[in-house]
Amino acid sequence: MLQLLSGNPRTVDALGFLLAFALTALMDSVFHDKLPHDHGRAFAVNGELSKGKARGSGLIFVLCIALVTLAVVPFKAEYVIYTVLLIASMLSGYFDDAAETAWNEYKKGLIDLVIAVVAGVTYLNFNGTEVNFLSWSFSLPYAVYLILIIVLIWASINVVNCTDGVDGLSASLAVVSIGTFLLAYGEELGDYSTAAIVFIGALLAYLWSNAKPSSLLIVDT
């Protein structure tokens, strides 16, 4: 939508970043006390330090990312599917966090696997199997590429689910990683670069709330 109002992609990127940051920061402040609170995890290092802190911040910043992304990138079926999958992944973690009894790990893992499969099939359907790396370009077999995507997404969703206290670390690394790809491949990424900038804006707003002494956690969302 904003691309229709401004013909300059850099202006759209800047607006997307500012909107994502401001909206996430505002919603974090408004809904902080309405989120479920962490009980700490006995098997996590210093897990008791998280006890009593608001958790499920992903519910806020993922919805902010979804709203801003749909406003600043062209309206295409591929992007809508990714947005729905992002929200679905967040909701599965949020309902797990909010439940009085934590979900069975197989239930959460299966939901995440379905999301990863749909995301992989969607990406390959719209982008093909060609891989570009530096000056090289080659194609992977469809099945191999799909398996790699599934493993990457499923592992990324679950890598911090069994830990406490690394929310800020994972968000910081995500900002650095996404920013590095933007610097290296910004032109080639096209609309993905705008969505990535929105992600960075929302994550930086979350990190403001997560800075020591942190009061807001992502946990499984």
Q: Where do the protein language model's features map onto the residues?
A:
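"…together with the soluble PPM/PP2C metallo-phosphatase catalytic core" -> "…together
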Residues: M1-T221
